[in-house]
Design a protein with these regions (language model features):
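Transition segment at domain starts
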Residues: 1-26
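Edge beta-strands of jelly-roll/beta-sandwich modules across compartments, strongly enriched
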Residues: 2, 83-94
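Tryptophan-centered short beta-strand motifs
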Residues: 7, 50-60
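Aromatic, loop-rich ligand-recognition surfaces of beta-strand-rich domains
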Residues: 19-35, 93
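Exposed aromatic-hydrophobic patches
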Residues: 21-24, 64-70
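Noncatalytic modules at the cell exterior or secretory-pathway interfaces
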Residues: 29-33, 70-87
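Acidic glycine-/aspartate-rich tracts in secreted/extracellular proteins
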Residues: 38-41, 50-52, 82-85
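Conserved Ser/Thr-centered positions that define the repeating blades of beta-propeller domains
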Residues: 46-48
């Protein structure tokens, strides 16, 4: 996979818990997740080596912001793990 020059949307105006579809990143390269629209919710960046078993790989966001990882695993996804209110969008660049 080659690095993206523009972010792609993983979560688009979601109003419930749930994970996005995974993207295949450049393993070992940096990745950036930007989340907006959080009023009362938690969004985690999750990674996987096999595309099946996912784990949260950095601090989950409870307010709008950006998380950065220096060495991405092969697969990445955004997961809204707690939802109370907000209209959440998550975009990734890797």
């Amino acid at each position: 996979m080659s690095s993206l020059t523009a972010p792609i949307t993983l979560l688009s105006a979601v109003t419930a818990t749930g994970a996005s579809k995974a993207v295949q990143a450049d393993a070992g390269q940096p990745a950036f997740l930007q989340v907006s629209g959080i009023t009362s919710a938690t969004v985690a960046l999750q990674g996987s080596l096999d595309g099946t078993t996912y784990a949260t790989i950095c601090t989950a966001l409870t307010a709008d912001g950006i998380v950065t990882i220096a060495n991405a695993p092969k697969y990445l996804r955004a997961n809204c793990t707690v939802y109370v209110s907000g209209t959440i969008t998550a975009k990734i660049l890797y």
